[in-house]
Each structure stands twice: as C-alpha cells, then as structure tokens.
Amino acid sequence: MIKTIKTTPYQDQKPGTSGLRKKVPVFAQENYAENFIQSIFDALEGFEGQTLVIGGDGRYYNREVIQKAIKMAAAAGFGKVLVGQGGILSTPAASNVIRKYKAFGGIVLSASHNPGGPTEDFGIKYNIGNGGPAPEKITDAIYARSKVIDSYKISDAADIDLDKIGSFKVDELTVDVIDPVADYAALMEELFDFGAIRSLIAGGFKVVVDSMSAVTGPYAVEILEKRLGAPKGSVRNATPLPDFGGHHPDPNLVHAKELYDDVMSPEGPDFGAASDGDGDRNMVVGKGMFVTPSDSLAIIAANAKLAPGYAAGISGIARSMPTSAAADRVAEKLGLGMYETPTGWKFFGNLMDAGKVTICGEESFGTGSNHVREKDGLWAVLYWLNIVAARKESVKDIVTKHWAEYGRNYYSRHDYEEVDSDAANTLVAILREKLATLPGTSYGNLKVAAADDFAYHDPVDQSVSKNQGIRILFEGGSRIVLRLSGTGTAGATLRLYVERYEPDAARHGIETQSALADLISVADTIAGIKAHTADSEPTVIT
C-alpha cells in the first residue's frame, strides 16, 4: 500500500559534481534521504512503468537507503527496479546496466573515494538514461524541489532480500535482484584481448590489484583471477566492507602506498593497480614507474587501437581542465578532436553521445570511454594490461618511449584539505580580482601569457559553465591551476595543479617536485596559499 508522508524540507541538499554527499548522521536525519529521493522523482517526468537501476558501493547505510529507494520507486510508479545483489553495483557497472537494459535512469549510492562508516561519508547520485550523471539542469531542478518539498510517497511493503538473486514484487513494482558482475565482465571481454592478457599472465607476468575493501573486489576476482588466470590472491582486499576496512578507499600514492612500495620492491609484482570506493577511479604502477593519471590518458589514447574494442580508432579525446595537456599532444599528432571540460564526468556525456570523443580522463585518477558514461577503474587497468601484452614491453618502457615521442608534461597536484571555507573562498575571490593584471608579468624565467577563470561552452547543447577554476598560463606551455573541490564533506579542499612541458628527452628524468619547484613557488607568490590556509605544506601531493 502506498503512503503519503508529510515532511519538512532541508536547505542543504545541493548536489555537487557527483551527487549529494554528506556524513552518515546527516543522511540518517528524519526523512533526509527520503526527501532527496522524492525530489529526484519530482524533478523527472515520463518514467511511469519504466525501469530504474539501483545499487551502491557497499558502504555503511547502503542497504538501508536501497530499501527506501525501492519502496519509493514503487510509490512513484516505476514498473521495474534492477538492483545489484547485496546492494552492490560499481558506478561503471551501474552505468552499463542502465544502458544495456535501456533503463530510464539509476540511483547510485556512493561517496566514491571518501571514507565509509557510521560517522563517515554517504552519497546519492542520479544517473540518466545514457548511463551518465545527471546534467546540471536536472541537478538544479532536484535542488530547487528539495527546498520546498512537503511530502513523499512510499510503499509500506516489507524489505526485500537483497542477497538472493531473483524476482520480487513490491506492490505493482517488479524488483529483479541481479548478479552485479556478470554484465560488466562480459562487456570487458568484448573490449579487450583476454587471450593476449591471459598469455601474458601465464608467461609469468605478475599482476596485483588492491580493491581497498571496496566495490571492485568481486569484479576484479571474476575478471583477473577467474577469466584471466591470475593466481588466487592477486586481488587484495577483495571483500567490500561497510567501512572499507577502516581505510580511505582513494587510489593514490598516500592511501595505496603499500601497493606502490610492493611494486617498486625488487621482488615485487610487475604491475600493480588500485581502485576506489565505487570503482570509477584507478591507479596504475609498473615496476619502477608510477603512471600519472594525465599520462595514463595520453598513453591509452596513443595506443588505443591495440585493444579489439577500439581497433577502428577513436573519434576524439576529452580531459578535464586541470588534467595535464599530455593528451592534447597525442590528439594533435593523430589528428583527433580534443576537448577541455570542467571537472566532473557529467561534462563528457554530451561529447560521447554526440560521437565527438571516445576516450576521456581526469587527473583525479579517472579514465574511461564511451563504453559507459562513467569513468571506469577496472577498464583502465585492463587497457593497460592489453597494451603491455600487445607491445610486449614493460610499463616503464611504454611510458618513457611515449615521453620521447611526445615530450613530457611534468605535473603535480597539491591538495590542502579541510581548509576553512571562508578563507578558501577569500583566497579565490582575491585571486579572481587580480587575473586581468597578470598577463605580461614575469616571475624569474616565467612570464604570464594569459590568466582567466575557466568557462566551458558545451559544443553540443551550447550550455555555459562559469567559474570552473582559475588558470594562469605561462609562455612555453607551463601553467598553474587553482580550484576548490566539490566532492569533500568537511571544510573546503583547495587544489593547486602545476604543469611544465619538457620536449627535451635528456631532461625527462628529473624528480617531479624539483622540475616544478619554480612554478610551485610562483603559485604561492601569486595566490598567497600559505597565508590564507594556515597550512605551510599540502595535505597530499600527487
């Protein structure tokens, strides 16, 4: 039976770059999750009798909200819900299920790489029928509705058994609990040369993947160990846990340091990779070589034809604005379209739907293609294994040869986390005021060529997104980018991106922070980061 429950609105349900993210105690407030889910449904139209996909990354509070979402979908008039067994669906797998079964859309429960647990992070994101995150016009409508909502509808049916694959009824709604891995693994087998990768592994090439007690564990075990023949135990931390084992499921050099150290040790594996909370990010490490996400995007694009699913070539490349320009040099050489977008995977969706790009990437360890409409951690890992198998070269050799051909973009990101929001906003406001005066100014050997606050003009729907990050570009291809992140839940995160282009192969072996030292110093001179943040050093350097 459908019940209508009176409620009062919350004023803080504004979705960020990847949905609404808050601490669990916030989501556990009376009607908080229900209000937001109802606001999603109220902002949509035309879903009567249609299919909705629901799944999450297994974090704390995932199961409870899934039950609420199913009952509210029944009350809203959806015809069918597809939900992952155990409430599990990685974000790229959810995107694939939406596309494969022509669903109306999907509710993805995740806070991505943020920690999980009773006092940690939770998130709700709506994905549209193409499998990608809802564009701003929809998230703006959801937010507007959430501020005035006065009731929600929900079925009073019993909870369904999420652990049992099969078909269930909730009032008039059919709920299919599906194997969360099967469709995704089948898609990967279509895109990549599993035979070549299997032979590589059988020949003694040792692969280790750290799933960080998050959602990709079951996917990586099925694909790497069962289908590609990697020894049992090659996938570490393979069981998804509500608190990710007490760890921060963010695949970078801080939170995946154990994996990095293992691959770099003399007797360690040849190849290591890690993925994040919901499976959309990746870190790739070869013996003696950490691959930056910006380089990874460029190298995958340059070698795209080596994978069967991309043998006909790619139509174009897109990258987020803070991502290094390494991919631009590949696009230029191969005669491909190159698009620079704001941070947030949703901006790539239009470009992929319009056939303008095939491969996309972000510096924040996100890479993907038009096979789904989300970034995809395991996809990137398998692409690298396919390239290694096809070229019969080590990761280190592949990267250094790429630099020799295209030049090296020295690149680093400095994160200042949990900065006082007012201080961070003041820093950005003061810097914005300065921008017009910077071009022509010299700082040592660095001369400012241009400075702006990045605005994106979408070539597909003509929409404009302003204030997407401050760029200071120097003559010769170096640049500094500053932006506030929209994915954390405590304070503000100020991100500084520093990049220097080096065409001379004889100068490709410099330690990254040393190669960028003058730019890092100039960034502080121009922006006054230390003065505004009270942090003399970044929290994380990538």
From Swiss-Prot:
Requisite cofactors: Mg(2+)
Pfam families cross-referenced by the UniProt entry: PGM1_C_vert_fung, PGM_PMM_I, PGM_PMM_II, PGM_PMM_III
Positions bound to Mg(2+): 112, 276, 278, 280
EC supergroup of this enzyme: isomerase
GO molecular function (one): magnesium ion binding
Reaction(s) the record says it catalyses: alpha-D-glucose 1-phosphate = alpha-D-glucose 6-phosphate
Binding note for cofactor: Binds 1 Mg(2+) ion per subunit.
EC identifiers of the protein: 5.4.2.2
GO biological process: glucose metabolic process
Active site, UniProt feature: 112
Entry's Gene Ontology cellular component terms: cytosol
Keywords: Carbohydrate metabolism, Glucose metabolism, Isomerase, Magnesium, Metal-binding, Phosphoprotein
Residues that, per the record, bind substrate: 17, 21, 112-113, 125, 280-281, 343, 362-364, 375, 495
Role: This enzyme participates in both the breakdown and synthesis of glucose. Required for the synthesis of capsular polysaccharide and normal lipopolysaccharide.
Similarity remark: Belongs to the phosphohexose mutase family.
Protein's recorded name: Phosphoglucomutase
Protein source organism: Rhizobium radiobacter (Agrobacterium tumefaciens)
Taxonomic lineage: Bacteria, Pseudomonadati, Pseudomonadota, Alphaproteobacteria, Hyphomicrobiales
Gene: pgm
